[in-house]
Every structure is written in structure tokens, then in C-alpha cells.
Amino acid sequence: MGSEMCIRDRETLPQSFPRFVFTAENRERIRFLAGEPDRWRNTRDRALRHLNNPDHYFDVEYLAQYELKTETLSHFRYRFVEQMADARARLKLELPEGNTDHLKGHPGFMPWSINEHYLKLVSSFSYLQVFKTMGTPEEITNAQANVVYRMGILSHFVVDAAQPLHTTEHFNGWTGENPKGYTTSRRFHSWVDGGFFRSTTDPNRAAITKQLNPAALLMRPASRDLASGQFQAIIDYILKQHRLVEPLYQLDKTGKLSKETPDAGREFVQKQLAAGSQMIGDLWFNAWKEAPPDRFLQRYLAQRKLKEE
């Protein structure tokens, strides 16, 4: 759906949110950075593709072959890899053929990617608040620039997750058994991502904004023993979009995602843009609210001040 549309996420933030984010320069910077992770695809180097590509999707259906459920997934990326490796050995699963990037049959890392980028934003807010009281003007400016960077990168993956095709093995046309006759076009993903609006008219930003609520604190699991960041809220968000995969294909099959009869398709995609905007705003807000002062940096800057006196 195009991260660089960049959405209406700032509409959800309170007036007390750091104001430097709202300058024209930083608004444009965030919009530009929202497309940055896709620009990392401009190389054909397999090592970078292997690293970057799985962060953009989470094909929920692939969990079944590993006998894994979303309720039991580790919040930690590499522990999740171990869960899959254990299942592959136990179930004697063979590696897919033609697997040049070593990614076929892999569900992807999108929930972990979003959560990790969220936590990096928490970190950026943590040291920004210390620099604001104890740092130099140059340090404050640099810390603010890092917050803007983290906000932009995080927003990309959240918008990816709002596009239902980023949550399914049917990410670019229906695959496998297809009794309902859904499209198998390899252009379907790009059509939903932006081709649909380019062929009709731009999204109605006012209609998107009407669907937004003020950013709010996200619910935490009852037990925090295994909790990490906002992983559970992110999984819930992704699963909600995954439930819309077949309705999206149904819209296409009935011609309602076409330039000739676009109204229902427009409503659907704008609703997803609103969902992405809401989640981005919520995660930005939570990162700011939850960021503790960077105690290590406080001690370092206090020692620096003593040496200067």
C-alpha cells in the first residue's frame, strides 16, 4: 500500500508529543525513511536479501508445517529460529528445492522486526531525554535525528503488516488448491500496494483520518516473565490483518478492486491505511511514554561535567 503515502500517523499523537517531530523537515524525513527498507532491496546480493526480505512478511500458514501456533512463539527472534529447527528435525521436514536465498517455506520475521525496531525507538527516546537535560546542543540535535530515523524505519514494517498480502503464503496471487477461483496473477500484490490507486484516484486522506483515534497505551500480557516490548500486541495486529486475506481476494474476484468499479476496494484499502496509521501512532506513543532515562548515559555525562569543572 506504499509506505511513502505515510499515512496519517501523526494525526493520532497528543500535543505533548515531542514537537521537533512535527517540523516540516522532519515530517518529510519520516515520510522518506518510511520507504527506506524497500530501498535496501536494490542489490541482488543474496546475503542482504536473506537478511532483509523476511523482515517484510509473516506468512502465517507456514507455521502449520512446523506444528507451531502464534500463542507459543518465542518473543525472541533466534529462539523462534530454534523452534523451527527443532520442529524440522523432529518432523523430518525436507528443505525446499530451488532455495537460492534460503528463504522458501520460511514464515518470515515481520513480528520480530516490528518489535525490535520499536525497542530501538524506545532506546532513542531514552537517551534523548538525558541529552536534553545534560547534553550539548549538538548532542541533542543528533539524538533527535536518531529518533526521527527510528520512527521512519519502524513505520515501514507496520504499514507492511497492514497490507494483508504481507501475512500470507498467497502474497502474490493464490497458490496451491484454488477451488474458489481466486486470481493467480503475479501482479496482484503490486496492484494492491499502489497500482489500484494510481489507476483511479489518490486515497481520500480525510476519510482515513476520520477512522483514527488518539494514540493509546497498548495492553501488556498479564505475565511479563516472557514479555518483550510490544510483541503480543504486534502479533494480534498482524493476525487481524491476516483474517482479511480472503476478503481481499473476494473483492478482486467480484470486480470490486478494479478501476471500473473501485468504491468497495477503495473503502477496504483506505481502512487498511487507517489501521496502519493507528498502529504506527500507538507504537510511537508507547515508545515515548515507556522510555526510561538512560542511566548509563546519565552517569557518563555527570562524570564528564565533573571533569570540566
In which residue ranges do the predicted regions lie?
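Sequence/structural segment immediately N-terminal to covalent heme-attachment motifs in c-type
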Residues: M1
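N-terminal, motif-rich segments that launch catalysis or mediate targeting to/interaction with membranes
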Residues: E4-Y149, I153, P164-A274, Q278-E309
